[in-house]
Every structure is written in C-alpha cells, then in structure tokens.
Amino acid sequence: MRILVATTYTLPGYSGGWTTPLDLFDDEHRAMYVICNAPRKRRTVEGVPVVGVGVRGLLSRPWKRAERLRRAAEDHLFRRTIERCFDDFQADFVLCLDEKAGYSAMRAGLPYVMRIHFRGGHSDDDPILRRILDGAVFATSCHTMHVEGAREIPHNQDLSRFHYRESPRAERALLLTGINPVHEPEVFVEGIMSSKSMRGDIVGDGPLRGRIQQMCRQTGGRVRCLPPVLRLQVPQLLDEYQIGVATGLKIMPVWYQMKVNAYMASGLYTITRPWTHVAVEAPDLVSTFHSPGELGEHLDRVSRSWEETLPVRRRARDWIHRNYSVEVPRRMFRQLLWEHFPKEMSR
C-alpha cells in the first residue's frame, strides 16, 4: 500500500516517528512524509520523499493578541499540504502520528489511521481527541501510552540491523538523544564528569545543541557533542561504544525509549532512568540512576567490573530480541490492514 505519514515534530532519518513506522512497513508498503514543523521544501531521505509544511518563524510561536488566528493559519497550511501530497503520492490513507496530524486529516476528509507517537496534552475524554479517534479507520498507540479506544501495537524497530559485540573493556559511553529539555542531555555531561575517567559522546540534534556543545567544550575532551546519524547508520555507530545511557524527565509513568532496545541488541550495558520501559519490565538487566552523581558511580562500577557484566549483557540481548521483535507489530498491523483495506491489500 501507499501510506502518507503525517506528523508534527518528526526529524526525518533520526527520530522514533521515522524509524518505527518505516521498520513497520518494511518493503511491503511505500511511504511519504508530511512534517508540520519541518522547513517548507521537498527532499528525499533514505529513499523516502519528505515534504515540510514550513510552520516555523512567526507561525510557530504564540501570538499574544491573535493566537486563534495563528492556530487557524497553521492548521490550514498543514491540512492543505496533506491534501496536496495525498493526491500527488496517490496514497491509500494517511497515517497520523499525533493528534494535530489526525485533526488535519479529519478536517480534510481523507481516510486516516492514528498511530499515536506523541500526546499533545489531550486527556482520553477530551472531545477533540474522541472526535479524532472516532473518525479514524482504526487507531493504535504504543504499549506504554494506554490511549482508550486505540489498539496497542509495540513501536519496535528492526533489531536484526544491530550487531552484538562483546568488547574487552568499557572505555566510552553513548547518549543517543534529542538535544532538548525533556531528554536532559546536561545530566549525561555532568554524570560523565563526576566519574573518575569515563569518556562519552552525545549524538543527536535539537534546540539545546548550542548550550550542550558549550558544556562539552569545558570537559577537556571527555564529552563530545556529535551530529546525529541516520537510522540505517546507527548500528555502525553503536559498535564504537560499550555503555549506553538513557536520560529523560518523567513525562509519563513508563517512558518507552527505543534507543535502549538498540543498546541492548548491540551488547552495550545500559544505564537509564527508573521510568524507562526496560527498567520497569526487566530491572535486573539495567542499572538506574536519579542524579548525575549516581550516574557517575554506575559508570565507574561498570568500567571497573566490566567482565562481570557479560552475563547481564547476554541476557539483555536475548530478552530484547524475544520481547521487542519487529515481527510482532508487523503481524498485528498487517492484520488490521487486511480487515480495513482488503481491496488495497490484495492489489
């Protein structure tokens, strides 16, 4: 099938809203992306056409005296871009990754499916969210999000891309992240510097990049801030590290952080916040921290007792492949498509 993916915030090539839908589709479906907050241009990323709506600058910030007008203009621009791309791509339906995208597809009168990657603050009984879900052909959400009326389908990535390695020593830690307040990258910098000798890299992009780069310059080379890498290049990147770190504020009771799955599949020892999904589901496979100082202590302990972590790393690899295989959501998604789009699926 031909699927137009509509989203507000996705970073093409990098974020979970890019990786998990494309891994879900595999080679069975063709995709095109419309991204509300991306620059207004058309390009191709990993062979996938991407159109930015261009809701930036003045339109991206609240207007004190005319906020309703600004929102109406933003919604209109997003909706018209979705309509145009739907026709140009000859799409079968729109896959919406958030409520804003779903609202635009609904207003456009197009067939749409909700695959909720991001909650925009609406509660389950919010009338706007209910209208969006009721108007969808079907709706799904991540298993840690619990949206009433949405089928829970894990947002798994294809772990077969990653190469499991058993490094002889632990010398460098990685934070693969969005560089924004929610992911608190400064905690990683402070944690590395509170350890005795660990070195680490932040790989990603986001609005705090300039400030984090400045912090890293003051570490004497122990912490670097590196550019993001594309989805298909992440396995090669992980080969250079031994410890994977996941920071992040407690924005939900259980936070699904896809990077942790990649860490574990690649043989990295994982240190994460206690509310990350794996820390809740398999606490014996990771270490958790509440403060930069505690992160530094874990880094020292793991480095000092690296060989002793081997059984844990092996169990983590087996557990993540067993519980987060992409074949499970692919099978569930395929079944839903056959139920709701039998003619298109049989083409």
Residue ranges and their predicted role:
Residues G210-L238:
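Nucleotide-activated donor-binding/catalytic signature segment of Leloir-type glycosyltransferases, i.e.
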Residues D284-E294, D300-E307:
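Conserved acidic donor-binding segment of nucleotide-sugar-dependent glycosyltransferases
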Residues L4-A6, R165-D201:
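Conserved donor-binding/catalytic core segment of Leloir-type glycosyltransferases
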Residues I3, F93-L95, A105-H122, V137-A139:
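Active-site proximal beta-strand in glycosyltransferases
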Residues M1-R42, M193, W275:
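N-terminal subdomain of nucleotide-sugar transferases
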Residues D124-D126, A150-R172, E184, R334:
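Acidic anion/phosphate-binding donor-loop and adjacent secondary structure
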Residues R304-P342:
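A charged, aromatic-enriched C-terminal amphipathic alpha-helix characteristic of glycosyltransferases
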Residues H183, L232-V234, G244-A262, I271-E281:
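Nucleotide-sugar-dependent
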